């Protein structure tokens, strides 16, 4: 997975995440929206409306109480924690 910063402002961050699709992006967006200080988290994977863009771009907006890069790091940690919890539950059920 390669990341490319599109825009990095004080309260807004846009990053292209190469090789991912709706499955991962929805989970990441949900984790970001659970964070205090994140006012919006969206992603775009629409090549028709984006001039041929095929890799997803996640956009994070904050209220200024959290840096958008820190929010991305915390959101990714939440995804990892949820994945680990699911794996443990799955193994226990098998």
UniProtKB/Swiss-Prot annotation:
GO biological process, one term: DNA-templated transcription
Primary site of residence: cytoplasm
Subunit and interaction comment: Part of the RNA polymerase complex.
Keywords: Cytoplasm, DNA-directed RNA polymerase, Nucleotidyltransferase, Transcription, Transferase
UniProt name for this protein: DNA-directed RNA polymerase subunit Rpo11
NCBIfam families noted in UniProt: PRK01146.1-5 (NF002236)
Gene: rpo11
Enzymatic reactions: RNA(n) + a ribonucleoside 5'-triphosphate = RNA(n+1) + diphosphate
EC number of this enzyme: 2.7.7.6
Functional description taken from the UniProt entry: DNA-dependent RNA polymerase (RNAP) catalyzes the transcription of DNA into RNA using the four ribonucleoside triphosphates as substrates.
Electron transport is among the record's keywords: no
